[in-house]
């Protein structure tokens, strides 16, 4: 809806580990340009060690934030990139309950913040990329 010419939503998806400051920055830069932030945090780090959840509760009351917790261990403690991919897949599964096929969804690392000016009235040339 924001920055788009139709009724579709722009959804920003990230995995979260422990950098609350980075998410705070991302949220404040993009909040006027993105319709929804979808975050997935795991109870395990990418080496499969149990960790505490670090996402700040102040964001849980934001209408624009959907937060999901992956609460099962990763199958392999040595394949950190595969474990991150599992976390993203879990995020994608949960997107099915909140996104529509008309929505535009982008995944990035939490520290890869898009330039918000590029999200204003942008034109999509292809749905997937």
Question: Would you name each region that the model predicts?
Answer:
Residues 10, 30-43, 62-66:
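Short loop->beta transition adjacent to catalytic acidic/histidine clusters or analogous donor-positioning motifs
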Residues 13, 93, 126-128:
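Catalytic phosphate/metal-binding cores of nucleic-acid and nucleotide-processing enzymes, i.e., regions
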Residues 12-17, 40-41, 107-110:
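Short His-Asn-centered micro-motif
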Residues 116-129:
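Conserved donor-nucleotide/metal-binding helix-loop-beta segment in metal-dependent transferases, i.e.
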Residues 38, 66-68, 106, 129:
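Hydrophobic/aromatic beta-strand patches that form the interior of the parallel beta-sheet core
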């Amino acid at each position: 809806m924001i920055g788009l010419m139709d009724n579709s939503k722009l959804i920003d998806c990230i995995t979260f580990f422990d950098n609350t400051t980075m998410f705070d920055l991302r949220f404040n830069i993009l909040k006027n340009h993105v319709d929804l932030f979808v975050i997935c945090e795991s109870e395990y780090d990418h080496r499969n060690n149990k960790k505490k959840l670090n996402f700040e509760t102040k964001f849980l009351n934001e209408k624009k934030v959907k937060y999901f917790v992956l609460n099962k261990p990763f199958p392999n403690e040595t394949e950190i990139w595969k474990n991150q991919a599992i976390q993203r897949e879990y995020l994608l599964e949960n997107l099915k309950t909140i996104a529509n096929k008309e929505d535009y969804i982008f995944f990035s690392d939490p520290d890869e913040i898009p330039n918000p000016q590029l999200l204003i009235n942008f034109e999509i040339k292809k749905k997937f990329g």
